[in-house]
Curated annotation (Swiss-Prot):
It holds the Pfam family DUF493. InterPro entries: UPF0250_YbeD-like (IPR007454), YbeD-like_sf (IPR027471). It comes from the Bacteria. Gene3D superfamilies: 3.30.70.260. Belongs to the UPF0250 family. This is UPF0250 protein CV_3095. PANTHER family: UPF0250 PROTEIN YBED. The lineage of its organism: Bacteria, Pseudomonadati, Pseudomonadota, Betaproteobacteria, Neisseriales.
Amino acid sequence: MSDEKQELFEFPCRFPLKIMGERHDEFVTTITEVVRVHAPDLAEIDVVLRESSGGRFYALTVTVTATSRQQLDNIYLSLTGHPMVKMVL
């Protein structure tokens, strides 16, 4: 058995991130900018917004072309540290 960790993903790969936060006029723009710091090739078509049934929250699905586990970790850390973000899956 190898001591190296086996990767669960083969990079590059398409990877969807689900980002939840309270409804805010700048939510989509702000969160997209945060992700683009780590994935500059993010296209508008890769961003899908859904509103909660009560209209209080947004759920944003952002699909990036991930090039490494480190890149995904950096995106996750940036998003979870942002004040507009309640949860990232």
